[in-house]
Amino acid sequence: MALDAFFFIVSLFLLFPSPSASESTTQFCSAGRENGVGSCGVSSTRILIKGGTVVNAHHQELADVYVENGIIVAVQPNIKVGDEVTVLDATGKFVMPGGIDPHTHLAMEFMGTETIDDFFSGQAAALAGGTTMHIDFVIPVNGNLVAGFEAYENKSRESCMDYGFHMAITKWDEGVSRDMEMLVKEKGINSFKFFLAYKGSLMVTDDLLLEGLKRCKSLGALAMVHAENGDAVFEGQKRMIELGITGPEGHALSRPPVLEGEATARAIRLARFINTPLYVVHVMSVDAMDEIAKARKSGQKVIGEPVVSGLILDDHWLWDPDFTIASKYVMSPPIRPVGHGKALQDALSTGILQLVGTDHCTFNSTQKALGLDDFRRIPNGVNGLEERMHLIWDTMVESGQLSATDYVRITSTECARIFNIYPRKGAILAGSDADIIILNPNSSYEISSKSHHSRSDTNVYEGRRGKGKVEVTIAGGRIVWENEELKVVPRSGKYIEMPPFSYLFDGIEKSDANYLSSLRAPVKRVRTEAT
């Protein structure tokens, strides 16, 4: 037994070379690393959830849910089952689809370092917070899409929950165009991201964006944009440095909301010109939200994704005299002044914005200190994978801004629909994957970097308390979070291929045909000879 215990401790050390305080008290199952199965009580193949209120995006009902071998088999009242079934009592609680986070960056090399959360630690944190799938962004290797995909295949090998990939486009040539087609048809990628910021590294020009939009349209893939005017941001950064503003507040001052609004408007107009759907990631300002609202009102297919930090926080933290505190709030686009977050909440509750992500991109305080003397070198990113589901419930459902069905829609179902994996994901329906949470609306939570499951030693939601706690998480038919205990198995997560031509492409061909018929061109002209 002593030898077994020794190897168990060694395996934990290898998984977590830089553990946070919380990881020393949390159980991570390392059994079965080679074949993806374990024996720590997480692999029950039959589960009956009794007496809860089952909530989907379209309705809710009192019903039981029966799961076998990772699939929801039945959703109906008073299900009777035989022996060897794990029974969970959900009386007085909500039974919901597990959250799907459309926007994460795990094991990402960025700004001279790498995010502190890899796929295993980030996903473990997600499961503790009720998120059962995420979609991460693949960054090409020197512009090479295939090399980038292969690198992220390796990064994600230890995954403990299901995940998908978006792909970033950082340059353009015929090879990129061919690789996009291969990734869509053979690798299950149906979305491509274009950065309009980060001049000199990830940023693309308008001509490249236009080529990318055309290629996305032809492939049935969704074009996504990080919308900030990168040239103006670069100028703003120089201006701040010249003024002697080198701290985290300079980050916000150099990238004001107007630059996010301008880039959002530009991307929307170019997408309209090509007639292809557009997804705007991390909408942080009223300026950007207003542009999305105008486009949607006109009938354009534009998706707006706020992130939980932009909905909940404001930028006063960036002026904190303690660099360690201020720097942990640095992300791009920046967290905005008071008023923007509430406006984004209103837009989310009225359908102007469609779903909530996190942009989970974590660095510890040592990494953030890389920009101690120059805000331009502070690694951009905040946490959110573990906190999103709790914060949105407490902030928007408890306040009456959202119903329980709306909550499911913006945290799970709409993401599944947009990325064409519904109803496999995002639903409590017979035949859907058994990714399920049990949320107790009367239970409370408190957020702390000392107890969270991220490897980061900081948390931008430190000390927040609220109501509505995820008490049980089931991922792939396995109970992975229960009684405040996290039990996850490396290599138990699956890569989820996402097919092209989601519902957002419905009607595109017809509108193209209508456009062509409206041109009254080319005009047939009769050549007349001069007399």
UniProtKB/Swiss-Prot annotation:
EC number in record: 3.5.2.2
Binding residues for Zn(2+) 1: 103, 105, 193, 359
Primary location group: endoplasmic reticulum
Assigned GO CC terms: endomembrane system; endoplasmic reticulum; Golgi apparatus; plastid
Keyword Metal-binding among UniProt keywords: yes
Post-translational modification summary for this protein: Carboxylation allows a single lysine to coordinate two zinc ions.
Residues engaged in binding Zn(2+) 2: 193, 226, 282
Note on cofactor: Binds 2 Zn(2+) ions per subunit.
Disruption phenotype: No visible phenotype, but unable to grow on uracil as sole nitrogen source.
Gene3D superfamilies, alphabetized: Metal-dependent hydrolases, Urease, subunit C, domain 1
Quaternary context: Homotetramer.
Name of the protein in question: Dihydropyrimidinase
Organism: Arabidopsis thaliana
